[in-house]
Amino acid sequence: MGSLQMQTSPESDNDPRYATVTDERKRKRMISNRESARRSRMRKQKQLGDLINEVTLLKNDNAKITEQVDEASKKYIEMESKNNVLRAQASELTDRLRSLNSVLEMVEEISGQALDIPEIPESMQNPWQMPCPMQPIRASADMFDC
């Protein structure tokens, strides 16, 4: 609407007061725009700094988590190895028990005396089956050193 007023009042074009007011408005608008641009740059700079800090924190967290996963993997491999050793020992002991039981059966046949020969427990024949129902084990998180 300001441009319409400028066209409708031809005497204002030559009026130095009008030119001064217009120049003053342009100067104020230019200063305001500069200040707004400066604030915008400051906001962007702060956002960039915040994002850089967040990236640093996330990288640190990622490194810690990776370290924990590696440690847990090592412990898992160690436990798996121990478990395999225990399974092999259980199998060997089961075989030895069978062998001893067969010797006892031969002694029983030869001597004619009845011997109390224990049967091999089901849990020894099928080690993946628990001999008794599973009961919850209470343990604290500190116990695992994760």
UniProtKB/Swiss-Prot annotation:
Residues 51-65 are annotated as: Leucine-zipper. This is bZIP transcription factor 53. Residues 23-86 form the bZIP domain. Residues 1-11 have a biased composition (Polar residues). InterPro entries: bZIP, bZIP_plant_GBF1, bZIP_sf. Pfam families: bZIP_1. A motif (Nuclear localization signal) lies at residues 26-33. The gene is BZIP53. Induction: By hypoosmolarity. Accumulates during dark-induced starvation. PANTHER family: BZIP TRANSCRIPTION FACTOR 44, BZIP TRANSCRIPTION FACTOR 53. Residues 1-45 are annotated as: Disordered. Residues 25-46 are annotated as: Basic motif. The keyword Transcription applies. GO terms for biological process: cellular response to starvation; hypotonic response; positive regulation of DNA-templated transcription; positive regulation of seed maturation. GO terms for cellular component: nucleus. CDD domains: bZIP_plant_GBF1. It comes from the Eukaryota. It is found in: Nucleus. The lineage of its organism: Eukaryota, Viridiplantae, Streptophyta, Embryophyta, Tracheophyta. SMART domains: BRLZ. It comes from Arabidopsis thaliana (Mouse-ear cress). Disruption phenotype: Reduced seed maturation (MAT) genes expression. Slight reduction in the dark-induced activation of POX1/PRODH1 transcript accumulation.
